[in-house]
Amino acid sequence: MVLASGSGGFAYFLPAAAIAFGSTGQAVNVPSPSAMASPSMLFTPSPSALPQVKGAFTVLLLGSDDDSKFTSDHVLTQSMILVRVVPSTKQVTMLSIPRDLYVPLSTGGYGKIDGAYSYGRAAAAIATVQQNFGVKINDYVWIGLLGLIHLIDAIGGIDVVTSNPVLDDYYPADVNSRYPFSYQRVAVLAGPQHLTGTSALQYVRSRHNDLQSDFGRSQRQQQVLLAIRQKAKQISPEDIPALAAALNNEVKTSISIDRTASLVALASTFDNPDAIRQIVLLPPYTHGGGPGGSINPNWNLILPLVHQYFP
């Protein structure tokens, strides 16, 4: 596990949600957490005993492959991050869920958790996370590859300091490409970097030559969320229509339009550098050796950790 403090995950999804006018308020039935009926269940998850706090809420952030190798109805989620926001204490917790985690799926059977969305869109992804982790999700925000590119370009790029270079000779050349199954070489050097939307996507998406494998990518994704948050502080309600046009409906969310203004105002109050916990489920919380290159969860360790922060 990596547990760190910072400032930013909360405000990442707020501008994304606020400018998703064309896809805002999509109805998604979010059931209460419950054990899945399966004769081969590895465990029976129970809802967290953490008490509900007035005004607090949990959002599932989903970042998808939506490039030309996939149809719009069958995309994987390269990124799944639970965000818990407690306005009364200005506390935020971000939990990165490994995309290769081998779990029971809400639609039936077992598979990598990144496939849940492809079988049943947001409702299936939400139900799978709820049922395995025993948490209650209030809302979701989904963003595709082009959506991330356009969002970051619309706010003028982001600034990060990379601790290690990202060098990938097998990065998919599948965004706006005539040859979606080809590869290209990408590089993001170590040190201070100003990233455009395309280079930021390369930074968070690359999964080759990282000594920490997919866990390193999870840490990079959270780092980019923090950088987006820095730029998002400059966004005012008057900027939202132009940003919405730039995204061109490439964000989907269950957060209704009438909530966005109050949420943007709330986000501006989260300026404490210690306001957010960042959690990545490194070994021994997970371990390799699962079917098809998946990783296995150690629920005896994961669930107590998750239920410290997520009801």
Segments (PLM) and residue ranges:
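Non-catalytic, solvent-exposed segments at the cell envelope interface
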Residues: 3-311
